[in-house]
Curated annotation (Swiss-Prot):
Family the entry assigns: Belongs to the EsaB family.
Function: Seems to regulate secreted factors that contribute to the establishment of persistent infections in the host. Negative regulator of EsxC. Not necessary for the production and secretion of EsxA or EsxB.
InterPro entries hit by this protein: EsaB, Ubiquitin-like_domsf, YukD-like
Entry protein name: Type VII secretion system accessory factor EsaB
Source organism: Staphylococcus aureus (strain Newman)
Length: 80
Protein backbone atom coordinates (compact mmCIF):
# COMPACT_ATOMS: atom_id res chain seq x y z
CA UNK A 1 0.00 0.00 0.00
CA UNK A 2 1.27 3.45 -0.92
CA UNK A 3 1.83 5.67 2.11
CA UNK A 4 1.77 8.91 0.10
CA UNK A 5 -0.77 10.49 -2.24
CA UNK A 6 -0.11 13.11 -4.90
CA UNK A 7 -2.65 15.88 -4.35
CA UNK A 8 -3.09 19.58 -5.00
CA UNK A 9 -3.28 21.79 -1.91
CA UNK A 10 -5.29 24.97 -2.48
CA UNK A 11 -4.46 27.88 -0.16
CA UNK A 12 -6.33 30.56 -2.14
CA UNK A 13 -8.59 31.33 0.85
CA UNK A 14 -5.41 32.60 2.55
CA UNK A 15 -4.01 34.53 -0.45
CA UNK A 16 -1.52 31.80 -1.32
CA UNK A 17 -1.53 29.66 -4.43
CA UNK A 18 -2.01 26.00 -5.18
CA UNK A 19 0.71 23.41 -4.78
CA UNK A 20 1.06 19.90 -6.19
CA UNK A 21 2.53 17.75 -3.41
CA UNK A 22 3.09 14.16 -2.39
CA UNK A 23 1.90 13.94 1.22
CA UNK A 24 1.61 11.15 3.80
CA UNK A 25 -1.83 9.57 3.76
CA UNK A 26 -1.75 8.34 7.34
CA UNK A 27 -1.33 11.62 9.28
CA UNK A 28 -4.31 13.32 10.96
CA UNK A 29 -5.38 16.48 9.11
CA UNK A 30 -4.16 18.81 11.87
CA UNK A 31 -0.64 17.32 11.66
CA UNK A 32 -0.71 17.20 7.87
CA UNK A 33 -1.63 20.89 7.59
CA UNK A 34 1.18 21.86 9.98
CA UNK A 35 3.67 19.73 8.03
CA UNK A 36 2.65 21.18 4.65
CA UNK A 37 2.70 24.79 5.90
CA UNK A 38 6.12 24.29 7.46
CA UNK A 39 7.51 22.59 4.34
CA UNK A 40 6.27 25.40 2.10
CA UNK A 41 7.38 28.10 4.57
CA UNK A 42 3.86 29.54 4.68
CA UNK A 43 2.83 31.48 7.77
CA UNK A 44 -0.90 31.40 8.39
CA UNK A 45 -2.13 32.50 11.79
CA UNK A 46 -5.46 31.10 12.97
CA UNK A 47 -5.34 28.29 10.43
CA UNK A 48 -8.54 26.29 10.19
CA UNK A 49 -8.13 22.53 10.56
CA UNK A 50 -10.72 21.73 7.92
CA UNK A 51 -10.04 20.64 4.38
CA UNK A 52 -12.62 20.33 1.64
CA UNK A 53 -11.89 17.66 -0.94
CA UNK A 54 -13.05 19.58 -4.01
CA UNK A 55 -13.01 16.55 -6.29
CA UNK A 56 -15.22 14.46 -3.99
CA UNK A 57 -17.27 16.99 -2.01
CA UNK A 58 -15.98 15.67 1.33
CA UNK A 59 -15.07 17.69 4.42
CA UNK A 60 -12.15 16.44 6.50
CA UNK A 61 -11.48 17.74 10.02
CA UNK A 62 -8.79 17.53 12.72
CA UNK A 63 -8.39 13.81 13.35
CA UNK A 64 -9.47 12.53 9.93
CA UNK A 65 -6.79 10.91 7.77
CA UNK A 66 -6.56 10.91 3.98
CA UNK A 67 -6.22 7.13 3.90
CA UNK A 68 -9.56 6.67 5.71
CA UNK A 69 -11.46 8.68 3.08
CA UNK A 70 -9.97 7.13 -0.06
CA UNK A 71 -8.18 10.34 -1.03
CA UNK A 72 -6.28 9.47 -4.20
CA UNK A 73 -3.69 10.91 -6.56
CA UNK A 74 -5.08 13.97 -8.34
CA UNK A 75 -7.55 15.05 -5.65
CA UNK A 76 -7.73 18.76 -4.79
CA UNK A 77 -7.63 19.67 -1.10
CA UNK A 78 -8.77 23.20 -0.23
CA UNK A 79 -7.89 24.63 3.16
CA UNK A 80 -10.99 26.32 4.57
Amino acid sequence: MNQHVKVTFDFTNYNYGTYDLAVPAYLPIKNLIALVLDSLDISIFDVNTQIKVMTKGQLLVENDRLIDYQIADGDILKLL
